[in-house]
Amino acid sequence: MKIEATRNQWIKFAIVLVLWLAFLVWLKSWLGLVVVPFIFDAYITKKIPWTWWKKSKNETVKSVMSWVDAIVFALVAVYFVNLYFFQNYVIPSSSLEKSLLVGDYLFVSKASYGPRVPQTPLHMPLTQHTLPIVNSKSYLEWPAWDYKRVKGFGEVQLNDIVVFNFPAGDTVAVNVPAEDIYRLSYQAGKELTKPVDMSAMDAAQQRMVFDHYYKVGRQYIDEKKQTFGEVISRPVDRRENYVKRCVGLPGQTLEIKDRIVYLDGVANKEPDNVEYRYLVKVHKPIPDDLAHKLGISYEDMAYYYPEAKMYNIPLTPKTKEALAARKDIVVSIEDVPGDDAGGLYPVNKNTGWTTDNYGPVWIPKKGETIDLTLDNLPIYERCIHAYEGNDLQVKDGKIYINGQETNQYTFQMDYYWMMGDNRHNSADSRFWGFVPEDHIVGKPIFIWLSLDPDRGWLDGKIRWNRLFTCVDNIK
């Protein structure tokens, strides 16, 4: 068969082929070689009528198919770009304020830590897990590929701001998707059963009580479908995206003492814009213009008690100092101590920890082995069972993993400890534990757009001073 193709066609084919092969080398996968004959046909032989509609005499067909062709091309391009190179992420909550603000749009690099090969490859581009309007799943559970990460430019570093999949989002009640269903189950079970004093109980006795709480609470959630909706499971890469700061690396021992994070006994530097809650007693309400000047949002101002003339408000060190200087408005500013805020991780252990005084906990590291006891098992059982896929049971005070009695476990993945800079208003690792390496999505590089939810379009909605701010410069 004689192949007739112009020099220009061969050059285009060669460029595309080289790029495609380089991409496969990066992935360390040769499955993509099946695409090469189609590339060859598209540029050289043209046996498959890829653009048959261009020869149609029907103008409607030509018009419609030109749009279909453009949309399909765009979706395929977006699919590959979002999977392997970068994606957009918008800050939905105040957990990282005042480092990252609600309404910041982030350019998130997948290549910084290495992109994951998709675990659910068949999904609709530009959706995370749900199709809008119809509210159905935007992905197919088959095929399901094992976790694999392509080599990136580096690894997660201490104090990096990281985008990751929500670890406790493996099981979700669809009507309350933002809630951690495990914590919700324990809380519901505790409220529905007779109060139990666990102060004098050992670890085995506590476990029996918490197991009962969970069973009762989960049954209640399953029955109250009108309130909670169906309880569904989600694969790792289809879980909600979160963004926090990494304050603990694999193999480190983390402890929070009087609000300060210690790693292996050494205090870690707090973020420049770290926030804590304070009781601000005032002569009169804080004016809107002053609040805006100081970066205090309407959300922050919501907790105002007019009878007591007092705010319960998160402040950075600089904002606290500036507000305290306004003696015409402020009477006093007092610390608000952290508490357990409805149940800290692990939710099935009576630790007595608070958001300001937590731990110590050792962060699991790949290849490291720990001694397991009933006392430390609640801290690590989700790593062993939910994240690394082992069968874990406790019978007669003994620990069984995959049917074998054991008192040790060797971790198969690295784990990280993530926290928000808004320390008293952040659902983070203090509430749901470790972030496994297979949940890491990428690294925010810069803010490409920032919209103030408290302002109108003609009243400073666009935060021009934040545009193209490098996230690495936000310490």
What annotation goes with each model-predicted range?
Residues M1-K475:
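Extended hydrophobic leader/signal-anchor segments used for secretion and membrane insertion
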